[in-house]
Amino acid sequence: VKGFVITHGHEDHIGALPYVLKEINIPIYTTKLTMGIIENKLKEHNLLRGTKRKVVRHGQSINLGKFRIEFIKTNHSIQDASALAIYSPAGVVVHTGDFKVDYTPVFGDAIDLQRFAEIGKKGVLALMSDSTNAERKGFTQSERTVGITFDHIFAEHQNTRLIIATFASNVDRVQQIINSAYKYGRKVVVEGRSMVNIISTASELGYLNVPENTLIEIDQMKNYPPEKMVLITTGSQGESMAALSRMAADVHRKVTIQPNDTIIFSSNPIPGNEKSVSRVINELSAKGAEVIFQDAHVSGHACQEELKLIYSLVKPKYAIPVHGEYRHLKANAGVAKSLGIPKENVFIMQSGEVLELCDDYAKVVDKVHTGAILVDGLGVGDVGNIVLRDRQHLAEDGIIIVVLTLERRTNRLLAGPDIVSRGFVYVRESEELMDDARKAVSEALEKCLKGRHTDWNKIKLVIRDAMNDYIWKKTKRRPMVIPIIMDVDV
């Protein structure tokens, strides 16, 4: 591996870097804002000084081994996003990165469609394209439409405090909030660690324009009337520790939700987060706040017509949908086929599969081991499927520990069985259930010992089965059962 080439600064594309760099310390190549965000992350892990980094401008190329990689300007829900044209001895492979076609971006230039067309005219072996919105017809709206929505909201809510939750990385969104705040004479407070860090980085690098005296510290809010304040905060996905969730739960140290507050969710729930977002909305509504969660967000990913445009400009021989769940990849494959790319030239890949490409053929030739490496506290990779399964089991049904003492020489029962439970039932209110469970274990243990079983693993298995059978019969639950046998000399 010669280097990491990063298309943009979203967490799902850069979050693993500090952990991977500890294993293979190789250079990072990316654009200015993306590098600034990465450097913040490397500082947290004390890796900044020892990591080689090179900032690349759109239109520039880098050389890695036999490959030349060109960075192409695109649009996305974070600034400085890039597509990659990878020039290899076998041909050119274009990777769109996460992208949309935005003809009127808030900051910088529109996607460089001309460069895509120029590369397409010279011949492209394969196109790897963003599949996130491949099921959606039409075009993705411009980010500027959200600014129009913000302007309407600010105009209609001039007598209330505004709290806006959005993705920390969406600098364009933050810029439009600041623009509206300045227009309507409001001070802006930024809350949430990730939000503060990215806004600070974007401002320092010239990607965010903040009028003088517009941003204030959260401790200065008390110096201004609520209707002259707007808070930009994290927590748009209902994350339990994010700033907005803590406000909703009345555990935020600096902000208390008031009945006349207006809260705007400038995001759509990521699949899987719907319940968390709904919980926060309900908590905020119960406090009397007005919650707005419609028409204040647009996607950063291309819909079908934008995908068709890129396919038409690039004219690839092979199509490789990327970045999405299987159904998204399949929808993207359908777009490619609708434009005349033969079915046998469209590849929906599984993680780990190795695709061999040349002008004459393309085929899957191997599969390498892949999978999730989980980070838990200071541990990296030490939590696997078995541990996750046990945690899920504990979360759903709790745990019962059966403790008994046997004489070492004869296996005679000296004490117990005692039962300790957590997360199953409240013992003081279920004494009869626990007493009967002890009897069930004692009877099973007595049969086992009469059969002269001396293998403690066998005895533990008998105890576990007896407890499981009894608890299921009485409660229709399956808590985790752990037998503990202590032996003593008498």
Identify the residue ranges that each predicted region occupies.
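His/Asp/Glu-rich metal-coordinating catalytic cores
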Residues: 1-5, 10-223, 242-256, 275-278
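Conserved hydrophobic residues forming the short capping helix/wall of the S-adenosyl-L-methionine
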Residues: 42, 336, 471
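Conserved beta-strand scaffold positions in the cores of enzyme catalytic domains, especially
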Residues: 53-55, 126-128, 263, 291, ...
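A general secondary-structure junction signal
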Residues: 57, 192, 350, 485-488
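Broad gene-expression machinery/nucleic-acid interaction feature
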Residues: 66, 81-83, 399-401, 481-483
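Short, low-complexity Ser/Thr-rich regulatory SLiMs
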Residues: 73, 404-408, 488
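Hard-cation-handling environments
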Residues: 136-452, 460-461, 465
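C-terminal tails and terminal domains of large nucleic-acid-associated
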Residues: 452-460, 464-490
